[in-house]
Amino acid sequence: MINSFDFVSFLVIKQLCSLNYVNVDCFGKDVLKIVVSQLKIKNLNMSLVVVGSMAFDAIETPFGKSDKIIGGAATYIAWCASNFTPVKQISVVGGDFPQAELDALTARGVVLEGVQIKKDEKTFFWSGKYHLDMNTRDTLDTQLNVLENFQPVVPESYQDCEILMLGNLVPSVQSSVIKQMRNRPKLIVMDTMNFWMEIMMDDLKHTISLVDVLLVNDSEARQLSGEYSLVKAAKKIMEMGPKYVIIKKGEHGALLFHENEVFFAPALPLEEVFDPTGAGDTFAGGFVAHLAKTKDISFENMKTAIILGSAMASFCVEKFGTQRLTEINAEDIKARVASFVQLVNFDIELV
């Protein structure tokens, strides 16, 4: 996990320099320790609650094939976000879900009080096969199992939630979590998919009206809005309720919309992509984790958040399932973010 002192130090420097009180070069490590202790910064992060599936996946791509492996939206989000901030998880698994996986998440600072374990039932299972472009796929098998009758319960210890991340689930299940919050979170982020648009559009639009940020891919944005232009699509979706819309374009990056403003974050070009299954969820995990860590949900900070989300997603696709996310450390993340900075950093002079 990223060292909390490093992050606190960074925020202190950023705040003081932004007020023109000091130049960043004035600070040595010893001075930073004094500044941090004097400011007595406590509870740096906003409380993050993640809702979503924890599952088994079996995946086939043109470059390899996996047996039954750990997957699920909430799993990817938690593995990613826990690099930066504590996570409180809401999900459901069967008695066949490995205790070792639950223990590993707990060791990362993921609170599992909201995860229901149905010992006599089976965990949600999905199997899919990706085409050569790695953007389209065919579902080979879906077994809802415990997810079929999932009724999430928000524990009392989760009621301090400030950022709520709703992973892809039945829209009515997502909205039920919002209703259980005594105080509305400061930011509600929602992911969804085309399947719900095809079979329960009214329920989906109702849930969308309750959230602040909607995450969709480009084809879903067009289907939801009825517009081909992604700019027009985002505007129409914002009219449904969300203040912000993020349109994910896979290997081509992501777009962030707010009112009349647009921000584009590229995807890092990779030599090899083994499994894109959890990339969108990992992106979401990086996005909300940065907002929680910095306690800043402004549009300007969301720009940084989607860069971090893109960086984390670039790790996810390098191996099957959550494996790569379990291996990376703070130095890996810093190096990957630096690669993103170099990717888009340029000087231009008109002549």
Give the role of each language-model region:
Residues 56-68, 83-165, 179-185, 334-351:
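Conserved N-terminal subdomain of the carbohydrate kinase-like
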Residues 230-351:
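Conserved phosphate-binding/catalytic region of the ribokinase-like
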Residues 101, 173-180, 202-206:
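A short acidic, amphipathic alpha-helical/loop segment
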Residues 8, 22-24, 31:
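Short hydrophobic alpha-helical segments enriched in small aliphatic residues
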Residues 182-187, 196-264:
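Conserved phosphate/ATP/ADP-binding segment of small-molecule kinases
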